[in-house]
From Swiss-Prot:
UniProt name for this protein: Tryptophan synthase beta chain
InterPro entries attached to this UniProt entry: Trp_synth_b_CS, Trp_synth_beta, Trp_synth_beta/beta-like, TrpB-like_PALP, TrpB-like_PALP_sf
GO molecular function, a single term: tryptophan synthase activity
Any Pfam family: PALP
EC number: 4.2.1.20
PANTHER family, sorted: TRYPTOPHAN SYNTHASE, TRYPTOPHAN SYNTHASE-RELATED
Function: The beta subunit is responsible for the synthesis of L-tryptophan from indole and L-serine.
Pathway terms, separated by semicolons: Amino-acid biosynthesis; L-tryptophan biosynthesis; L-tryptophan from chorismate: step 5/5
Enzyme class label: lyase
HAMAP family: Trp_synth_beta
Highest taxon in the source lineage: Bacteria
Record keyword Lyase present: yes
Organism: Bordetella pertussis (strain Tohama I / ATCC BAA-589 / NCTC 13251)
Gene Ontology CC: one annotated term: cytoplasm
Length: 399
């Protein structure tokens, strides 16, 4: 096993990551970094975090053998890490609990968040209600339309939802607005970023709170199959569910890590969100990474049937894993993801989020060419209730 200790002291993963923000945010980031570096080694903080994961979220989440599907495909065995069974229905809550506990220790009574699919917004609103905090969630107006049920859920939980009408009206625009709010209300506000992007310490902090996913798998897989899997597959938008399951496996060189980006309507159409496949190195939301850009270096509008993958950048650690060759990245189109969504419902009785359906589609694509003793572990990062309207619309139905 190779040791792995990135990022460095300045928050860099090789040439990626770092801190590229306005001077007005430097004090807040320094304060956050100091608080996090203290809490991450504080046994009482770790105990409280683990207690909440067990009793509030319902962890550990199980690993599950998709046996009927594996048998039907006739190749490798597909296993799911069932993050869809968490309280709030996705992996997002792991990170939100960690950051909310940190906010409480820092004496910040107000939390803000950006959200795409709405899952991070729901998870933030949920933990804000749990700890009695004020909560404001920024969401692109296009995503508000796509994810109406999650918007209502956030409001039920006591959050204020602010629709953002600028740019493509999606996740990147919501992130911009959240940053503006944070600058304005820095004294009493904690910004809970939902993915492994943003300026240091966010990429490593979000990753650390999400690694519970992979840590559990390291224990669970030997219990059920006697060893670790051959492949670990996860969807990548910003990349937090993928980093959560990848990171503990990085030292295990015989385990191949495969991230799955949104190829949208097809890579050749330009209507996709595959930053690692088609982006160039640039700076977005405070860190250096692969960014979807046009010929003038402006951030390009992205497309995916899945709101949570519809982001023009990617976490800097994924950029590093790609360049170093430790992880590979593939693209799955809208149509392939929708087919996997329907098959998963009918064959396994599990309705995955459209984000997770991209990872499942990649596993299904790989399986027939592999021998039956090979094992693919897929991070089923969330459940698909939130995507009912999108899926029905694509099938020409009105709910």
């Amino acid at each position: 096993m190779k040791p792995y200790d990135l990022p460095d002291a300045r928050g860099h993963f090789g040439p990626y990551g770092g801190v590229f923000v306005a001077e007005t945010l430097m004090h807040a980031l320094d304060e956050l970094r100091a608080a996090y570096d203290q809490c991450r080694v504080d046994p009482s903080f770790i105990d409280e975090f683990n207690y909440e994961l067990k009793h509030f979220v319902g962890r550990p989440s199980p690993v599950y053998h998709a046996s009927r599907w594996s048998q039907r495909l006739g190749g490798a065995q597909i296993w799911f890490k069932r993050e869809d069974l968490n309280h709030t229905g996705a992996h997002k809550v792991n990170n939100c609990i960690g950051q909310a506990l940190l906010a409480r220790r820092m004496g910040k009574p107000r939390v803000i968040a950006e959200t795409g699919a709405g899952q991070h917004g729901v998870a933030t609103a949920t933990v804000a209600a749990r700890y009695g905090m004020e909560c404001v969630v920024f969401m692109g107006s296009e995503d508000v339309r796509r994810q109406a049920s999650n918007v209502y859920r956030m409001k039920l939980l006591g959050a204020t939802v602010v629709p953002v009408d600028s740019g493509s009206c999606t996740l990147k625009d919501a992130l911009n607005e959240a940053m503006r709010d944070w600058v304005t209300n820095i004294e009493n506000t904690f910004y809970i970023i939902g993915t492994v992007a943003g300026p240091d310490p966010y990429p490593r902090m979000v990753r650390d709170f999400q690694t519970v996913i992979g840590q559990e798998c390291l224990t669970q897989m030997p219990e059920v199959i006697g060893r670790q899997p051959d492949y670990v597959v996860a969807a990548v938008g910003g990349g937090s569910n993928a980093m959560g399951i990848f990171h503990p496996y990085i030292p295990y060189e015989n385990v191949r890590l495969i991230g799955v980006e949104a190829a949208g309507e097809g890579m050749e159409t330009g209507r996709h969100a595959a930053s690692l496949a088609a982006g160039q190195i640039g700076v977005l939301h405070g860190n250096r990474t692969y960014v979807m850009q046009n010929a003038d270096g402006q951030v390009q509008e992205t497309h995916s049937v899945s709101a949570g993958l519809d982001y023009p950048g990617v976490g800097p650690e994924h950029a590093w894993l790609k360049d170093s060759g430790r992880a590979e990245y593939a693209g799955i189109t809208d149509d392939e993801a929708l087919a996997a969504f329907h098959d998963c419902c009918r064959i396994e009785g599990i309705m995955p989020a459209l984000e997770s359906a991209h990872a499942i589609a990649q596993a299904v694509k790989m399986t027939p060419a592999l021998s039956k003793d090979k094992v693919i572990l897929v991070n089923l990062s969330g459940r698909g209730d939130k995507d009912m309207h999108t899926v029905a619309e694509r099938a020409g139905l009105q709910l």
